[in-house]
Curated annotation (Swiss-Prot):
Main location class: cytoplasm
Assigned keywords, A-Z: Activator, Chromatin regulator, Cytoplasm, DNA damage, DNA repair, Nucleus, Transcription, Transcription regulation
Compartmental location: Cytoplasm; Nucleus
Species assigned in the record: Candida glabrata (strain ATCC 2001 / BCRC 20586 / JCM 3761 / NBRC 0622 / NRRL Y-65 / CBS 138) (Yeast)
Protein name: Protein AF-9 homolog
PANTHER family in the cross-refs: YEATS DOMAIN (PTHR23195)
Lineage, top ranks: Eukaryota, Fungi, Dikarya, Ascomycota, Saccharomycotina
Amino acid sequence: MAPPTSKRIKTLSVSRAVIYGNTAKKIGENRPPNAPSEHTHLWTIFVRSPTGDDISYFIKKVVFKLHETYPNPVRTIEAPPFELTETGWGEFDINIKIYFVEESNEKFINFYHRLRLHPYVNVNPPMSTEVKKEETGNATTSDEISSIFYDEIVFNEPYEDFFKILVSKPGNLLPSNKTEDCLFSRQLEQDELTRIKMASSNVDKEIEIYKKKLEDTLKSR
């Protein structure tokens, strides 16, 4: 990391939205070249803008660390799109490191994503995972699994030079409603808050029921 050439802007924070995750499909009759015979799925791991915009103005590179059974398991993507495609048969945790442009003088961020090849078996799957029906291609079947998460990277007190870079773009603002091109929206966020409130309310009701039962039991003794 080079020494900063500008000062930090105190009491200021700038956030940039990203999505990360993977898509996966079963391999069809025509297998991808060099795919091992035991591999059953074709998958892609990625870091993107939720609106499909370019994020390379603040992200320098993304490093994906795959399972050690893969050749060269540490894969570095230094230009958009920040993604890689592989084949495999099992689910595992992928370590993701996001490095920022030199002007940021920020440390990389480090997190994990659980590679998902199969849909959830519960009746009401989380919003992050869905099955998408598509036309059957030569290499894969028609059912695509998506495990995608939304997050915001917050830069606290950014350096002046980096701040200028950040504000040179609109900031990947989420649309009001979900579209085919953008699954995440402000409406989805509000829906999630509503579900959390409903769940919290249900828990409170259950607690009151059990408290009443306990009180009745103690009185009957």
